Amino acid sequence: MKKFIIALLISVASISFADEKNIIDSISDNNRLQKLNEFVTKSELTKNLLDYETLTLFAPLDDAFAALSAKTYYGYLNEKNRDKLQKLVNYHFVEGIYDNENIEDVITTKSINGLDLEIKKINGILYVNGAEVVEANIKFSNGMIHLTNRVLIPK
């Protein structure tokens, strides 16, 4: 019985601490977001992202990055294209918390770099600029992550 109670306390503690991770830790610790982690790290935006009070991240899964052509993928990672990389990374973040449960129909908002994003719900499925949210409402210390099936490319 003691072992059961200790195991229960450990599992409850790990659940409550999961929400205590910041956005950068949440990305780097998720094995399905390693490509996004690489982009965030190379963009040198880590400190900027930690400065926001609340954020929602529409996080492309590694498979979404794999769908990009090699030229596009490595083009963003080229040192000469840091501005483009930063624009791409920032395009996936929205200031504030956008919970899947609170979005009824269609809303337009701005990414943290000021570009428009259309978020809509169709038959209970959330989309952002046409990318499907395949897993929603992953909480971190000051916001929310929604995993998407496509990389959002700013215009």
Task: Give the residues covered by each predicted segment.
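Bacterial Sec-dependent N-terminal signal peptides
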Residues: 2-3, 41
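Sec-dependent N-terminal signal peptides
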Residues: 4-13
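Generic cytosolic/nucleocytoplasmic N-terminal low-complexity/intrinsically disordered segments
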Residues: 1-2, 109
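Mature, structured domains of secreted/extracytosolic soluble proteins
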Residues: 16-155
